[in-house]
Design a protein with these regions (language model features):
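Cofactor-binding active-site loop characterized by glycine-rich and histidine/acidic residues
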Residues: 1-11
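Short acidic, Gly/Ser-rich segments with clustered Asp/Glu that frequently serve as metal-coordination loops
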Residues: 9-12, 19-33
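Short beta-strand segments
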Residues: 21-22, 64-66, 94-96, 115, ...
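Glycine-rich loop at the start of a catalytic domain that most often binds anionic cofactors/ligands
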Residues: 34-39, 55-61, 74-80
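A short aromatic-anchored loop/beta-hairpin motif
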Residues: 40-69
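Long, charged alpha-helical interface segments
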Residues: 58, 75-111, 125, 148-177
C-alpha cells in the first residue's frame, strides 16, 4: 500500500482507492465523539441548504454545524464538547466548512474514512490492513488552506504508517499553531 498526501481538492475528486479525510479541530472530532456517545445514525451534508431540507423532513435529527442557518433554525455548534453531551438515541446531521465538503469531494473513492488525532491509532491500525493505496486529505484543502493542524496530522499519519514518526510530537506541533 502506498500512502500519499493530497495537495489539491481536484486530486480527491478523481481518487478511486482509499481516502482518509482529516479534520483535526472540528468535524472529524465531532463525528468521532457522536459515534463514541453511541449514535447509530450520523449523516453528513455538504451544504446548509441540503441539511435544512433534510431536517425539515426529518425533525428527529440534531444538527451540528458552525455555519450560518436561517433565523430560528435550531442547531448545535460543530463542537466535540457539544457532541459529548449528545443523547445517543437521537440521530445526528453534520454540515461544516471543510470536513463534510471534503467527504463529498471524495465520492469516487472505494472507501472513505475520517479522522484526526482523536482516532489516530485506531485509524492507523485499520489503514495498515488495507491493500489498496491511501490518499490522506487535509480537509483544509476544501476551505481555509491556512489550517496547519490538518496538514500536520496527515504528515504524522503518513510517517506513522510508513514506520517512522511520532504522533505525540505532531500533537505538540499543533499546540504551537
Amino acid at each position: 500500500m502506498n500512502v500519499l498526501i493530497a495537495k489539491t481538492k481536484e486530486e480527491c475528486k478523481v481518487w478511486t482507492d482509499n481516502i482518509v479525510v482529516v479534520d483535526v479541530l472540528r468535524s472529524a472530532t465531532t463525528i468521532c465523539q457522536l459515534l463514541q456517545r453511541g449514535k447509530r445514525d450520523v449523516r453528513v451534508f455538504e451544504d446548509v441548504s441540503k441539511a435544512v431540507a433534510f431536517k425539515e423532513k426529518n425533525p428527529q435529527f440534531t444538527v451540528y454545524s458552525e455555519l450560518d442557518f436561517p433565523q430560528g433554525f435550531a442547531h448545535e455548534d460543530n463542537s466535540p464538547y457539544a457532541a459529548s453531551k449528545a443523547d445517543a438515541g437521537t440521530p445526528a446531521l453534520v454540515v461544516t466548512t471543510a470536513g463534510t465538503k471534503a467527504l463529498f469531494g471524495a465520492r469516487q473513492a472505494s472507501q472513505i474514512f475520517m479522522g484526526g488525532f482523536c482516532n489516530f491509532y485506531e485509524l492507523a491500525a485499520l489503514l495498515k490492513g488495507l491493500s489498496r493505496d491511501v490518499l490522506l486529505v487535509p480537509s483544509a484543502l476544501f476551505a481555509n488552506k491556512d489550517d496547519a493542524e490538518d496538514f500536520l496530522c496527515v504528515s504524522a499519519l503518513k510517517d506513522f504508517l510508513q514506520g517512522f514518526g511520532n504522533a505525540e510530537l505532531a500533537v505538540n506541533d499543533v499546540k504551537n499553531t
